[in-house]
Amino acid sequence: MAGHSKWANIKHRKGAQDALKAKIFNKFSKEIMVAVAKGGSDPNSNPALRLIISKARAKSMPKSNIEKAIAKGEGSTSNGENFKEIIYSGTLSHGISVIVVILTDNINRAIASLQALFRRANGQIGKQNSIPYLFEQKGYLEIEKNNLDEDDLMLFSLDNGAEDFQSDETNYMIYCQPRKISELKNEIEKKFSPNFRAVEISYFPNEWVELDQENTEKILNQIDNFLDDEDIQNVYHNLKFA
């Protein structure tokens, strides 16, 4: 069941590697603090925290950074409680649809920045917390191939709740219902002890838009501008890379 990774078309980030990692780790730290404030600091009894830690580890976030974020959420709950997640849909030029996930301690600032970003991109902001029909939420696991047998992993994944299994030259991609992701990840980890490159609950488009190279680069630059905003956690889109 080899196929092309959809994931590469959905999430896009830029910049020098060190700066990029620092930005990603900062976003994970905020998510960890919020999860601790809502459900406590024990990953065994807090599935939201357990999933975020899995995501952070998949992106090589140092253990010390994770522990520091947990301590901040635990020792200063006002920090975690003041962060709010809001989701906006919208469109960019050439009919590109986006979902923007915001995690902020200042909603007015975040919305004002988002409106400005859409204006600069000649786009149109949509409704808050309204997911367009073009997108579907799914759990996503990406695993390095290494010496893992594809058939063994595929059959095991499908038997444990996966809905789709794909592969490219270096990775296996597994899709499932969002509520299944923690259980599926844990079962795969116990059986195979693989190297996870991604553990996500994400938004996947049902329809793609493909542009020429020049306009693709323009859209990707606009998405980069969104991701540079301190309050924006993720941007999901339906632009298919040429």
Swiss-Prot record:
Q: GO BP, one example?
A: regulation of DNA-templated transcription
GO MF terms on file? Answer: DNA binding
- State a single Pfam family of this protein: TACO1_YebC_N
Cite the SUPFAM superfamilies for this sequence.
YebC-like
Q: Which PANTHER family match?
A: TRANSCRIPTIONAL REGULATORY PROTEIN YEBC-RELATED, TRANSLATIONAL ACTIVATOR OF CYTOCHROME C OXIDASE 1
Give its localization: Cytoplasm
Q: Identify its protein family.
A: Belongs to the TACO1 family.
Q: Which domain of life is it from?
A: Bacteria
Q: What is its main location?
A: cytoplasm
Q: What is this protein called?
A: Probable transcriptional regulatory protein MHJ_0471
- Identify the keywords attached in UniProt to this record, alphabetized: Cytoplasm, DNA-binding, Transcription, Transcription regulation
Family annotation (InterPro entries): Integrase-like_N, TACO1_YebC-like_2nd/3rd_dom, TACO1_YebC_N, Transcrip_reg_TACO1-like, Transcrip_reg_TACO1-like_dom3, YebC-like
Instruction: Extract one GO cellular component term from the record.
Output: cytosol
